[in-house]
Amino acid sequence: HIDPQPELQDPYQRLLSVIEGNPEQVLNKLIDLGQSSQVFTNHWQVAQRQTAKLLTQYQAPFSEFSAMQEILKKVPKDIQIHLSNSMPVRYANFLGIAPSKTRVWANRGTSGIDGSNGTAVGHALSSDQLSLLLTGDLSFLYDRNAFFHNEDLSHMRIVVFNNFGGGIFDLIPGPEALDPAEKDKFLTTPHQKDLSHSALDLGFDYEKCINSSELNAI
């Protein structure tokens, strides 16, 4: 951890070492140390190319994953993307985003999903670039007040992957050991909210896609 302050907060007790100093200056010093071995980088790039090739052969019914794959293939180069918790950032990390002028942002709130909309709005308001928020239904619904203002968001687009609850808890290890009723009540929190009502209330145009053809038509 690099920080100009000698006294640091470490609530998770996970810091192994602390470098006291200005982060930018310290990192510039590391650059001056010279070129390190490229062996690891080369292996990583080979694996990345192999994975990218496999992903082009991916065939499955329309799903959140395939939708994310299509979206990332078609986003403009000069754009900033904000990834919310929990599945959107995992999908994007797995699929990868092609190197370009794209700026990628993400944040994790205390409970994971909280604050994603607000952070994305802040990035949109601080830039003239087209901004794209890729988020889940719970993340979007949890932080709707982030759009309750009179600022211009005409250059912002929002894609909500709506699986009507916390779909992440069906994929990660641990929650399957819970009683199903407890899991639904405290983790998955299933719902039947119609997000078109939120879009209308917030003054956004709304499109719903339930297959690849509808997604590609937008």
Predicted regions and their residues:
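General beta-strand structural signal in soluble alpha/beta enzymes
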Residues: 1-3, 21, 64, 81-85, ...
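Glycine-rich, acidic loop regions that bind phosphate or pyrophosphate groups
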Residues: 1-45, 150-151, 172-173
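Glycine-rich beta-alpha junction loops
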Residues: 6, 85-87, 163-165
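Phosphate- and divalent-cation-binding pockets in alpha/beta enzyme and binding domains
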Residues: 10, 29, 70, 90-92, ...
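Hydrophobic alpha-helical scaffolding
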Residues: 12-13, 17-20, 54-61, 185-189, ...
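Generic structural signal for well-ordered, non-membrane alpha-helical segments
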Residues: 23, 37-44, 48, 60-68, ...
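Active-site diphosphate/adenylate-binding microenvironment
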Residues: 45-128
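Thiamine diphosphate
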Residues: 94-218
